Amino acid sequence: MAKPSRGRRSPSVSGSSSRSSSRSRSGSSPSRSISRSRSRSRSLSSSSSPSRSVSSGSRSPPRRGKSPAGPARRGRSPPPPPSKGASSPSKKAVQESLVLHVDSLSRNVNEAHLKEIFGNFGEVIHVEIAMDRAVNLPRGHGYVEFKARADAEKAQLYMDGAQIDGKVVKATFTLPPRQKVSSPPKPVSAAPKRDAPKSDNAAADAEKDGGPRRPRETSPQRKTGLSPRRRSPLPRRGLSPRRRSPDSPHRRRPGSPIRRRGDTPPRRRPASPSRGRSPSSPPPRRYRSPPRGSPRRIRGSPVRRRSPLPLRRRSPPPRRLRSPPRRSPIRRRSRSPIRRPGRSRSSSISPRKGRGPAGRRGRSSSYSSSPSPRRIPRKISRSRSPKRPLRGKRSSSNSSSSSSPPPPPPPRKT
């Protein structure tokens, strides 16, 4: 008893939880016997007051929790009856309905008249004519309720298509109008409650839908911003940036998304890479110009078609390593027709030496438009010292032309 009494005393003083309060009630009797007189009064007062307050607090929230559930259930319960009522008329109209709907009545017909007429078929419990309250005149239809289903069926058979006050009347089974009148206010009262949460939910859903959609819309933009950065080096390798950079102002205005992707990174990056690569960029151009010059040589002379093939096979690794800036080939292609006649003019020089280097030099020098072959070799010989020996070597091995520069470059190759 000592252990439980201690556990009960401490909660009675603290009154922290509802369980402790309930224990303080049950444990108040043993605590009296064990505790002193002063502690009794304190424990009793403390235990009684917090226990009541805590218990009331603990009991009240579940009641509150139940109370909202009650109205929610009440709000939910009324709508099913209208659905049942909607489905029931079809069933009752065939089987159980005791009310006849009499339509197309004249304004002279009263409820008493209907009761007399339909009373011939059986006991009539209730008769009602729909009134237009604004004008206080009958709307032209009424309801007659019979006590027995058989009587209602007889009345429906005889009175459907009969004449009352010179008008042909339609009689059909329906539900009494009172249920119709009384039922709509319930669903109407319940409907706003439902509609309000639905509208709130719809608004919340719309907001939720709007929220994720906006980030989704923004996410593709972010992706596009990132994707061009990732894709930009590839187009640079594929010669796109230089074609786009001169044409970019014209292409940016129409605003095709693909071109924007290609153009936006050059706007951001070209400043830094152009500054950083400007000194280093010319050598890669020089290295790359000859490989594209070689196919044109091949076109010119079939004998040289065989020689460049080994060059292409062996040279691709350095080209791939230096591939990212392929900007010069555009200029090479645009100026290539001018340089071809230059080759024909330089035929007086040994054809292998004059034509080969002229094509290489003219194409590699992206800034010289159509210079004489003599000027080109001077500029290119300085810039292309590293790669000429490679081709010179191969050309000398394939073709009997030997040039002085080839022997030193092989160490540069390695």
From Swiss-Prot:
Region of interest (Disordered), residue spans: 1-95, 175-414
Consequence of gene disruption: Several developmental defects, including defects in flower and leaf morphology (petal development), delayed flowering time and root growth. Hypersensitivity to glucose (Glc) and to abscisic acid (ABA) during early seedling growth, accompanied with an enhanced ability to accumulate ABA in response to Glc. DNA methylation establishment and maintenance defects. Altered alternative splicing pattern of several related SR genes.
Motif segment (Nuclear localization signal 2): 229-236
Residue stretches making up the RRM domain: 98-176
Ranges of Low complexity composition bias in the record: 10-34, 42-60, 176-191, 364-373
Induction per the UniProt record: Levels of the isoform 2 are altered in response to sucrose depletion (Suc) and temperature changes; reduced in cold but increased in warm temperatures.
Location (main, coarse): nucleus
Motif Nuclear localization signal 1: where in chain: 62-69
Tissue expr: Especially present in actively growing regions and dividing cells. Mostly expressed in roots (primary and secondary root meristem), shoot apical meristem (SAM), leaf primordia, pollen and inflorescence, and, to a lower extent, in leaves, vascular tissue, hydathode and fruits.
Pro residues bias locations: 404-414
Gene3D superfamilies assigned: 3.30.70.330
Start and end residues of each stretch annotated as Required for isoform 1 function in petal development: 218-219
A Gene Ontology biological process term: RNA splicing
Phosphoserine found at: 77, 256
Positions of short motif Nuclear localization signal 6: 373-380
Motif (Nuclear localization signal 3): 284-291
Record key words, sorted: mRNA processing, mRNA splicing, Nucleus, Phosphoprotein, Repeat, RNA-binding, Spliceosome
GO cellular component, one term: nucleolus
PANTHER family assigned to the protein according to its UniProt record, in alphabetical order: LD23870P-RELATED (PTHR15481:SF0), RIBONUCLEIC ACID BINDING PROTEIN S1 (PTHR15481)
Function: Involved in 5' and 3' splicing site selection of introns, and may bridge the 5' and 3' components of the spliceosome. Isoform 1 is required during flower petal development and isoform 2 is involved in root growth. Negatively regulates glucose and abscisic acid (ABA) signaling during early seedling development. Involved in the RNA-directed DNA methylation pathway. Modulates KIN10 stability in response to sugars, probably through the splicing regulation of 5PTASE13, a protein implicated in the proteasomal degradation of KIN10.
Subunit-level organization: Component of the spliceosome. Interacts with AFC2, U2AF35A, U2AF35B, RNU1, SCL33 and SKIP. The interaction with AFC2 depends on phosphorylation status. Interaction with RNU1 defines initial 5' splice sites and interaction with U2AF35B 3' splice sites in the early stage of spliceosome assembly.
Protein name, per record: Serine/arginine-rich splicing factor SR45
Species assigned in the record: Arabidopsis thaliana
The gene coding this protein: SR45
